[in-house]
């Protein structure tokens, strides 16, 4: 990952240089709290025995993984990605209602991590791309993330469908 791609003994050299030049760092829509998906598969043994990228079954290990990402990058200016997708940027495995509840649990945990690191006021983003669009809008049985007040201080990035067609538009 960029934050650890520095040469020699200083693995944070790239992040330090970016910070020196005033570059605000962030990660993609499927790399929460400064942690890349490939990092998880390379480092999961530091956090437990399961490599499952599944917050339902591996919450403790994934939370610690995110905590370490924030600890590593908190001295630099970042935009913190919130949310979670399935392995390799896929959809989550539950029903829409289950996944809405899961994402609310995930985002609450992520915001708690930021708060513990005095980063509650740091910029945060939730990207509403195709894997999470249904959870944004919700269903007849479960209110989506769109009206969830926990996200009032989070930038919501609305995306196209890879062909230039907007999937969701702002209402205000």
Predicted regions and their residues:
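Gly/Pro-rich turn-and-neighbor structural signature
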Residues: 59-172
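Feature activates predominantly on carbohydrate-active enzymes
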Residues: 1-65, 74-80, 150, 155-158, ...
């Amino acid at each position: 990952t960029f934050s650890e791609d520095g040469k020699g003994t200083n693995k944070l050299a790239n992040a330090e240089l970016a910070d020196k030049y005033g570059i605000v760092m962030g990660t993609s829509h499927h790399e929460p709290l400064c942690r890349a998906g490939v990092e998880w598969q390379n480092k999961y043994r530091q956090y437990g025995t399961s490599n499952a990228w599944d917050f339902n079954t591996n919450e403790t290990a994934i939370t610690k993984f995110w905590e370490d990402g924030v600890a590593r990058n908190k001295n630099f200016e970042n935009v913190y990605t919130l949310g979670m997708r399935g392995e390799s940027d896929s959809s989550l495995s539950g029903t829409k209602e289950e996944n809405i509840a899961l994402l609310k649990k995930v985002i609450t945990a992520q915001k708690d991590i930021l708060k513990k690191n005095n980063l509650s006021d740091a910029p945060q983003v939730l990207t509403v791309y195709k894997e999470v669009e249904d959870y944004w809008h919700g269903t007849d049985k479960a209110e989506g993330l769109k009206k969830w007040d926990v996200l009032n201080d989070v930038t919501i990035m609305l995306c196209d469908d890879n062909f230039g067609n907007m999937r969701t538009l702002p209402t205000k």
